[in-house]
Structures are given as structure tokens and as C-alpha cells.
Amino acid sequence: MSDQDLVISALHVAPVANPDHEILKGIDLTVGQGEVHAIMGPNGSGKTTLAYALMGHPAYVVTSGKVLWQGQDLLKLSVDKRARLCMFLAFQYPMAVPGLSVASFLRSAINAHRLGLNPDPTVDPTDAFKGGIPMGEFRKLVREKMALLKMDESIAARYVNEGFSGGEKKRLEMLQMAVLEPQMAILDETDSGLDIDALRIVAEGVNAMLNPKMGVLLITHYQRLLNYITPDTVHVLAAGRIILSGGKDLALRLEAEGYEPILAAEGLEAAVGDEAPEAAPEKAAEPAMETAH
């Protein structure tokens, strides 16, 4: 185990609004550099809660457990400090930010990210046009990454996610990932709401970004995304804990049989949907998190 591994130990998480109702009930998981781990599970099993807890979402409280990342106790860090440690979260439901152009948003995000790596008191990360990445370098970088994701360059002048289709929103999430080059990427149901063509383009973009220095936690409900992105390990999350792990064959088994046989083997038939409270805060709290990319 190295400092570049994400190490989750006995993690228990509950909603702030109902701290006695734990959604995650003892998650143990290690994601190493260059590894892709897929988290699959029925609705309400705690998949999104895991993603949000790792990034410090204010709607959730860690009741016990530990998370180590880059040699630090992640749970003691603020959201912005987690992001500056090269962690990235792609949302399942990206929010619109009227009045903020994609170009300004991306440049501010890049500046904040680079300041996290190399602090410079003369640069204001909240100002996209003062200091930070030179405009020429920024334009070249964004054009290169847009081409990778087959995005129209005109999207840079539009307001963030305002009037975007589902596919455009997901591609913008991937564009953020591409320009920021995180060392740990958490992709929360990136395949949801995508038709087969958009799914293929997004998956090809993710594959092009995979590298030996980046770990990926890929959260998905369906096996179809794994037809394009090959995971090193597949985990089944149900009733707030990982009940089974395996290779890609496990995802194929889930596609063929569904979750019921595995849940039944664990005596969890009645647990399907038990964790539904995790879904409640998703849309309400996302705008504040969007800047944490």
C-alpha cells in the first residue's frame, strides 16, 4: 500500500438530517494508482453516498471509519482541500450555473487546482482572468480536450449546463476531468441518461484519460458502461456494505441474473431500497460542490 492509494476503512456514513439512520455500514475498499474499481448495486444501496462522503458533501456525516489519501486523513480536510489533493467527482446530476461561462469556470478550476499543487500568493483562483494559466495555453488545452470528447468548441461560451442536453452535461463533467488531470477520479453514474452513442463517446474519453498515476472509482447501476471501460475489480454494494467483489465476469453475471440471487445469498432480499434516504439531498446541495472539481 502506498500514499497514492485511496484506502477506505470501516466507513460508516449517515445523512445529517437523520444521523441515526446509517446508509453506509462499514465500507472497506482500497483503490490503487492506475486501477479502475467499479461499484455496482441496486438503487438506494449507498453508491452515491459513498461518492459524496469521500468529497465531504455537507448533507452527510461520517459516524465512524477512516479514509487515507496521499498519506493524509481525508475526513479531516475541507472540500476544497480534498479537491486540491487531486481528487475529482463527476456528478450524476450536474447543476446549471446561469451567468458563468464554461470557459471562465474551467479556467478558474484549473487555476485553483494548480495553486493547490504549487501555492502562489499573487494568484487569485476566484478570478479566471488574473494570473494563473496563460490564455494561450488555456485555449490550446481546452480545444485539445474538447476534440477528445467530440465537443463543439462553441460550448465554451455557453453558461455552465444551462440548456445542456444530458449528453452535453456528462461530456462537460468529463471535460473538467480531462483539463484537471486528477489522481483520483470518482465517476458517479456517468452513464445515466446517455444514449448508446453518447455513452460510447464519453467512455472513449475516459479511456483516453486513464493512466498509471490515476485511480478511478466508477459507480454504475448497469453493466453497459463496462462494455467500454474495463475495470480491474467489480464490487457489489448492497445495504450499505460491499457484499461481493470480483472481476468483469461479476458485472456480466449481474447483467444476466440481476441483483436478487446475490442479495438472497446474503439474506438481503428485504434490503433492496432500504437506503433510499441517500437520494434526497442530491440536487439541493450540488451547486456548492461543483466548484470543488
Feature-to-residue mapping (PLM):
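Walker B catalytic motif
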Residues: 186-190, 197
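ABC ATPase NBD Q-loop/coupling interface
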Residues: 66-82, 161
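Conserved H-loop
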Residues: 213-221
